[in-house]
């Protein structure tokens, strides 16, 4: 005789959390200038980023690196080479660049050569930063271009180059205002890791950064956002989540675990975040179910494995949602707020499901 054992939703959520990829601690974020947009299209169309290094040749850089493995000594050697490039004026004996400028140039070359690594995220602005492109660095070492590439990309030889896979570009007006602060830095290359959460929520609906899980709700309403609708959406969603937690008997999770960061632009983003990753995953799945499902971007999945576990959770939430009349009323209220704010469906649902399934197949 077969006995149907109760489903342990806590174990299912724990398994999902274990397999959701965390943004690596070593990942860095770089703003790379394009000479007032001059090289924006060249970088985009040819899948690379570059830094002018006319003050020192790549051959000399490679020679210095082979000689000086210590970063401090390597940087000092670069500074000496850059200083030699700016020869003193014959009449005054002064260099055409002061020590501060020489140090700045050397530091930029050093950063690009040694610190921009595979897996890092790069951001490039067009003219007046009207467009901004985001990409992932594909190699740590300086790119070696073929003769054909050098013929096609007429500026390639004047740069230190690294290959990039471009993810997406955005009109500046559609970006989170907090990203604008990056563009106050005018150096050729600037590390912008302090904006990591803002950058990631521009690109993803769900991510884990520095042990904190983020669920992004995209509000797409074009004109002014009604305060009652905005706060009603948040309150009602957390009430639904609290009921789901109770109905599925989820342990050590509460709607009180969440903090919120709101970009109140129209359109804008609501960032629900918590260090209780299990709760954020449950909120993600709940939003997907109450938001209308998870058809997205043509992703296909295996029928077994972790997607099956995710399916069990979402089916349970669906069953909860449909069980009683007052829950139907609760969903109607949520839908009313969601529709007023034109909240985007959760695009990353199938991507996350595919991600955790792929992770399950990797050797531990």
For the regions a language model picked out, list residue spans one by one:
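Compositionally biased, charged N-terminal/linker segments
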Residues: 2-107
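Short, well-ordered loop/turn sites that connect or cap secondary structure elements
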Residues: 110-117
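Short, charged beta-turn/beta-strand-edge "cap" motif at the junction between a beta-strand
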Residues: 115, 125-131
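Short beta-strand-centered aromatic/proline hotspots
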Residues: 121, 130-144
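Short, solvent-exposed secondary-structure boundary/capping segments
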Residues: 139-164
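Membrane-active, amphipathic/fusogenic segments and juxtamembrane/transmembrane anchors
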Residues: 181-281, 291-293
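Membrane-inserting effector segments that mediate pore formation, membrane fusion
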Residues: 246-338, 348
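Extended, charge-rich intrinsically disordered regulatory tails
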Residues: 329-363
């Amino acid at each position: 005789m077969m006995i149907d054992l109760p489903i342990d939703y806590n174990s299912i959520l724990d398994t999902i959390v274990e397999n959701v990829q965390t943004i690596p601690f070593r990942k860095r974020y770089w703003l790379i200038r394009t000479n007032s947009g001059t090289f924006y299209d060249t970088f985009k169309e040819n899948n690379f980023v570059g830094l002018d290094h006319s003050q020192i040749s790549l051959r000399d850089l490679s020679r210095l690196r082979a000689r000086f493995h210590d970063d401090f000594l390597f940087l000092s050697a670069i500074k000496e080479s850059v200083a030699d490039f700016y020869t003193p004026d014959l009449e005054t004996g002064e260099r055409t660049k002061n020590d501060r400028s020489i140090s700045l140039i050397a530091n930029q070359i050093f950063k690009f050569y040694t610190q921009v690594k595979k897996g890092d995220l790069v951001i490039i602005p067009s003219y007046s930063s009207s467009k901004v492109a985001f990409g992932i660095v594909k190699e740590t070492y300086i790119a070696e271009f073929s003769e054909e590439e050098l013929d096609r990309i007429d500026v390639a030889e004047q740069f230190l180059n690294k290959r990039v896979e471009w993810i997406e570009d955005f009109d500046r007006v559609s970006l989170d205002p907090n990203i604008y602060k990056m563009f106050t830095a005018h150096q050729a290359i600037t590390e912008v890791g302090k904006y990591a959460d803002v950058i990631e929520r521009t690109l993803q609906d769900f991510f884990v950064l520095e042990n904190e899980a983020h669920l992004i709700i995209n509000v797409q309403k074009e004109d002014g956002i009604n305060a009652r609708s905005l706060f009603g959406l948040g309150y009602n969603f957390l009430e639904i989540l609290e009921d789901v937690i109770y109905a599925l008997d989820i342990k050590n999770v509460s709607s009180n675990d969440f903090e919120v960061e709101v970009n109140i632009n129209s359109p804008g983003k609501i960032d629900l975040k918590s260090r209780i990753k299990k709760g954020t995953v449950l909120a993600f799945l709940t939003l997907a179910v109450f938001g209308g499902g998870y058809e997205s971007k043509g992703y296909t999945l295996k029928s077994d494995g972790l997607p099956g576990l995710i399916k069990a959770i979402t089916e349970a939430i669906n069953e909860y949602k449909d069980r009683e009349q007052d829950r139907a009323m609760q969903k109607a209220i949520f839908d009313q707020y969601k529709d007023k704010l034109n909240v985007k469906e959760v695009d990353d649902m199938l991507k996350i499901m595919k991600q955790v399934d792929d992770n399950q197949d990797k050797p531990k």
